[in-house]
Amino acid sequence: MRAILVANAKGGVGKTTVAVTLAAALARQGHRVALADADRQGSSLRWLDARPPEAAPVRPLDWRRGKAVGDAPKKLDWLVIDAPGAIKGDKAEALVAESDRIVAPLTPSVFDLAATEAFLDRLEEIRRVRKGKASVHVVANRARKGRALN
């Protein structure tokens, strides 16, 4: 199983949107996919509940309580994890431990850029990332061609 953690310490950058879009796209390609919601708002779980029955299946996992982290079925191709906002400390370490890819959404704003840079610096302090066992990727969200940072 491959696991993608969608995370950023900055709120409002589209973590949930990116997570649910990734999960749906992977499921449409025929992969066995679960979407773990680690955000107390539970937006990913609500999105799964609202999907039409004919949509490609995505298995819901409720990781909002710390002890549930890591609880995933064995027969999955992909696990997509929707991280909470302000992820740090032990929670960040636990979620990164479950992941081999980390996607950090970034919106085109000076404030978001600064917060994301700080988040990426903190990720580098986590041993799994530092040793190259979890790759880190930044995804531009709500960006338009030719548009400068606000």
Where are these regions (language model features)?
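P-loop NTP-binding core
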Residues: 1-150
